[in-house]
């Protein structure tokens, strides 16, 4: 069935987005001096936190859709 494959692809995408945002957040927090191109570090940290939160919400939605699909079988 193609539906679960599409949802799994979306899940993989959102998981990668979360990982990228978490890595960016860690870089800002652990080495703010090395991020010279971003004068508004607080704004960048807030943006990264929002990106992590958004990705986690989408991951939960994908997981819920996969669970619903399993119950239909």
Name each model feature, range by range.
Residues 2-73:
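Extended, charge-rich alpha-helical interface modules
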